[in-house]
């Protein structure tokens, strides 16, 4: 199954490993990317892995993934609580989509309990740390296999 999955990471995730390790863990975004690429290689999946602190760039990457990628994973970080633009872009992507959060957003401050972007995805994985990315990859791969049956 050679398919492409786009993985997008939002603001401040480039500081993983340094930023609030009690909440986000000690792994860096580079560690997470390496683990995703290792999983993808075993599963014969191609991944595009991106990070931006800019909402418009994330929107553009979602738009680029339309027609190019079979699935999409997004950790919108703080934009999940504010971005209708990301929600609208996610709604345009027709393949399986998963929102990932390293921390358990419902055990944090009340303003983090609402996610606009979650309306535009098929599943949310929250509170599993970096394993959430692997769970999302496995979910999307399974959805794509089931679609081919």
Curated annotation (Swiss-Prot):
Alphabetized InterPro entries for the sequence: DHquinase_II, DHquinase_II_CS, DHquinase_II_sf
GO function term, MF aspect, one: 3-dehydroquinate dehydratase activity
Active-site residues, as the UniProt record annotates them: 24 (proton acceptor), 101 (proton donor)
EC id: 4.2.1.10
SUPFAM superfamilies named in the record: Type II 3-dehydroquinate dehydratase
GO biological process: amino acid biosynthetic process; aromatic amino acid family biosynthetic process; chorismate biosynthetic process; quinate catabolic process
The protein's name in its UniProt record: 3-dehydroquinate dehydratase
Lineage: Bacteria, Pseudomonadati, Pseudomonadota, Alphaproteobacteria, Hyphomicrobiales
């Amino acid at each position: 199954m050679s398919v492409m999955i786009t993985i997008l990471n939002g603001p401040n995730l480039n500081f993983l490993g340094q930023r609030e390790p009690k909440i986000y863990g000690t792994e860096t975004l580079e560690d997470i990317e390496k683990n995703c690429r290792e999983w993808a290689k075993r599963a014969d999946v191609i991944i595009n892995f991106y990070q931006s602190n800019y909402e418009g760039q994330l929107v553009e990457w979602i738009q680029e993934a339309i027609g190019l990628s079979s699935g999409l994973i997004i950790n919108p970080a703080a934009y999940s609580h504010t971005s209708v633009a990301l929600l609208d872009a996610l709604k345009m992507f027709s393949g399986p989509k998963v929102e990932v959060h390293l921390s358990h957003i419902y055990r944090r401050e009340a303003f983090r309990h609402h996610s606009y972007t979650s309306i535009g995805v098929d599943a949310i994985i929250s509170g599993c740390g970096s394993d959430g990315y692997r769970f999302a990859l496995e979910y999307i791969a399974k959805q794509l296999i089931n679609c081919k049956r």
